[in-house]
Amino acid sequence: MKFMREEYFKWYSPNLNREIEMLVFGHAGYPVSLFPTSMGSYHENKDQGLIESARWYIEQGLIQIFCPNSIDKDSFYNKKIHPVHRIQNHTWYDKMVCHEIVERVRNNTSSGKVAVAGCSFGGYHAANFAFKHPGYVSHMFSMGGAFSIKSFMDGHWDDDVFYNSPEDYIPGINDHEIWNMDIILGTSNWDICYDANLKLSGVLARRDIPHWLDVRQDREHDWPVWKEMFPHYLSRIKFF
């Protein structure tokens, strides 16, 4: 009988100087790091049914999904601190994901890479991580993502902001691994982030970076369409 294993992890992150919580779904398979939406918890993707939409892949041992919590409340959405500290907090979060999660699980694959995914602002996290670390990422699935962080920075601009703003740093990217990545920008004509996806698609196209701009029809920026997209996109992973 097939089953979907669920495990809870909590550890002290040296990069963030705080505790991090994470759910892991599956007993074996290709690693997928799945980010929550804005200020979301590690259990949000389970609560909203996104994990359930991928149950077949999980039960078959084809994928393992890693769901860390975000620190958006202390980075992009923390208006009580200066933008310098907001982006620094996010930079440390990126290091945590890279060194404490991805580097530990990517050796489970023959390619030494992982897939990353997320909905809404989780799509930003997935895209930004993938494009900053293309040597670690084989697939990037953004569903209803928005990719500019300028609105969070109150006019502040520095290197940390630049190198966490995909539409700004992609034009100068030279890591050949990004041309080998399976990139999907999932959106719809009713999506509030539709224009953001068109813009990022244009940025990628100008660098001749292969990608799929998947535009669904008459669907809102919400979980129902993301639960349709996610299992569809997972089918693109070469599991063996």
Predicted regions and their residues:
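Non-catalytic cap/lid and distal C-terminal segments of serine-dependent acyl enzymes
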Residues: 2-240
